[in-house]
A protein has these predicted regions:
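Terminal, non-catalytic domain-edge segments
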Residues: 201-221
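Alpha-solenoid helical repeat scaffolds
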Residues: 15-18, 22, 148, 152, ...
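Short acidic-aromatic active-site loops that bind/stabilize oxyanions
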Residues: 1-5, 131-132
């Protein structure tokens, strides 16, 4: 949420500049710098990755330290508060603990509260929904961040296209040509939830566009 807020402030700042509203733009520029400084101070862990949430008192608790896929979105906005070194630390953690070929886990597989499978009673499904279940839609943001902060974006993009090709099997199960809402947190990752989820498909298409563009032109996005 903080990353989206920072991005929104920066976008409005740039729009004001285009309209010649320099004084208003300067105020938003000062605000954006304040947001960035505060965010990095409060949300950065000692290892350079990000706390997931902070309680009202601002002091990290057990929930803050859980590794979840939300931190990937801080890397993919047009305006980001995260510098390259920190971004690479975040990507390494996401790749190690959350990444699967069909999406990102909602909780690290090393967390004691990790649920590897989504199923059972309504209560059991609810307990797994955000506690390890793989969500497909964050995959687009993850791949964009991989390209953006790569030292070799062209090769990274080609690798991503190869990884995306592995999703052909997912497109052929359930509802043909669609990607499900969620998948089990452990392999084999069975599709669960909604069998044709619009945001899963949309992010898959975005990932293809990002990777094909970077592979063709060899630039970060």
């Amino acid at each position: 949420i903080n990353a989206y807020w920072y991005n929104a402030v920066c976008i409005v700042r740039e729009l004001l500049k285009k309209q010649g509203e320099e004084e208003k733009a300067a105020r938003l520029d000062a605000l954006s710098q304040k947001i960035k400084k505060s965010f990095l101070k409060k949300f950065t862990k000692p290892d350079g990755t990000l706390y997931d949430v902070l309680p009202e008192n601002g002091e990290p608790d057990d929930a803050s330290k859980q590794v979840r896929c939300n931190e990937i979105f801080a890397l993919t906005m047009p305006f980001t508060m995260i510098e390259e070194k920190q971004a690479k630390a975040i990507l390494a953690q996401v790749r190690r603990e959350l990444y699967t070929p069909v999406g990102l886990r909602s909780l690290s597989l090393y967390d004691p509260q990790f649920h590897p499978h989504y199923g059972g009673t309504q209560f059991e499904r609810d307990m797994a929904y955000h506690q390890g279940t793989v969500w497909a839609y964050p995959l687009g943001a993850y791949y964009r961040a991989c390209i953006r902060f790569s030292d070799e974006p062209k090769q990274t993009a080609k690798d991503i296209l190869h990884q995306l090709a592995q999703l052909n099997a997912a497109l052929a199960e359930g509802c043909l040509g669609q990607i499900a809402e969620i998948y089990d947190g452990e392999c084999p990752a069975e599709s669960r939830g909604c069998f044709a989820q619009a945001w899963s498909v949309a992010e898959l298409l975005r990932a293809y566009e990002d990777a094909e563009t970077a592979a063709a032109f060899g630039r970060n996005i």
